[in-house]
Amino acid sequence: MVFLFTLLNYIIIILLTLWLLTSLKQNIETKPPLPSPTPTPTPSPTPTPTPSPTPTPTPTPTPTPTPTPSPTPTPALSPTPTPSPTLSPTPSPTPTPSPTPSPTPSPTPTPSPTPSPTPTPSPTPSPTPTPSPTPTPSPTPSPTPSPTPTPSPTPSPTPTPSPTPSPTPTPSPTPSPTPPPSPTPPPSPSPLGDPMYFPSSVGTTDQLRDYIRPLCNGWPRPRETYAVPWDCQRVMHCSYFSLPLHEVTCNDDSAYSFTADGCVPHYQSDCPFYPLNTL
């Protein structure tokens, strides 16, 4: 029974709260229409102050009547407080009229016209162009340099000697024939080097090879080629393309510079060998 009783109490409380909520909603819905018309008239007077700047450009005394219309909006605000006690949320729109004082700074632009006369003095420096006549004398000196160019034609005869150097290049072709004599030095016996002597006991190619082998390896700067004394055109090379002590014939092998006109003495041949003479 106690449980049922408590349930009934809860149901009653819920019903009461619902009823209160609905009644409050109805009151709120009915009352907002009243403040809604009030804000509409209040903004309408605010645009009216905009015409007030128009009188300011005309005479300066006109700004004095502008304060007189300012009290007229104040009675329009007086009816607005009457709805404010009816609803607590309405005070939020009431601050909106505060922007109305903002138009009052509009008279401050009036000083701006006063600086406008200040630019007028800027034209006063315009008399400065008076120095412009002074540059006019400067053109008068310019004719004076004109006589100076007249001596310039006098150097013109000096270029006439320039043709005289032209004959000098003609001797330059004379050195060009000098290169042809350069081929003449090859026949000289200078590449032969100093003659080298070998013992008279050496009489065959094998004996000569055995005699030359230590000479190819032992000297600090070993000779590369040696002439065979019993053959005018045969040369013994220490290392002929990695072949040790290879015999080369000057007339047949193109690896050497040689004369192919028969057997000639070693001192006349241009083969790069060192002649060997018998002791």
Swiss-Prot record:
Organismal lineage: Viruses, Viruses incertae sedis, Naldaviricetes, Lefavirales, Baculoviridae
InterPro entries, per database record: Chitin-bd_dom, DUF5478, SDr-like
Claim: Disulfide bond is one of the keywords in the record: yes
Domain Chitin-binding type-2 span(s) in chain numbering: 213-273
Sequence ranges of Pro residues compositional bias: 32-192
Keywords: Disulfide bond
Disulphides: 250-263
GO molecular function: chitin binding
Name this protein carries in UniProt: Uncharacterized 29.3 kDa protein
Stretches the record annotates as Disordered: 31-203
GO cellular component annotations of the record: extracellular region
